[in-house]
Amino acid sequence: MNERDDILQAVYEVILDRKGALPESSYTASLFHKGIDKILKKVGEEATEVIIAGKGGKREEIVYETADLLFHTLVLLGHYDIAPADVYNELRRRFGTSGHAEKASRNE
């Protein structure tokens, strides 16, 4: 792992620690308590905010909103006990493969 992986893993571990906590103890615990529909709603909201920030073209806003999207995506992964390493491995599998070839392989 490198420094980028480490911060995502560190955040993920905190998220998992809060998974079984009382909802009033943290924002993350409250998301888990509200269930998958609330988590998915937040991921969708944050994705929309990234799109809006991207359209606006302001670097700071894009970075800020992308951080929110990554956080909420990690909560989604945590809900299903999917480690960030699983996503990294999928990206590594795709790396160096043409996007067209990768997409075609999914249709086989």
From Swiss-Prot:
It holds the Pfam family PRA-PH. Signal peptide: none annotated. It comes from the Bacteria. PANTHER family: HISTIDINE BIOSYNTHESIS BIFUNCTIONAL PROTEIN, HISTIDINE BIOSYNTHESIS BIFUNCTIONAL PROTEIN HISIE. NCBIfam families: histidine_hisI (TIGR03188), PRK00400.1-3 (NF001611). Belongs to the PRA-PH family. This is Phosphoribosyl-ATP pyrophosphatase. It comes from Geobacter sulfurreducens (strain ATCC 51573 / DSM 12127 / PCA). The lineage of its organism: Bacteria, Pseudomonadati, Thermodesulfobacteriota, Desulfuromonadia, Geobacterales. The gene is hisE.
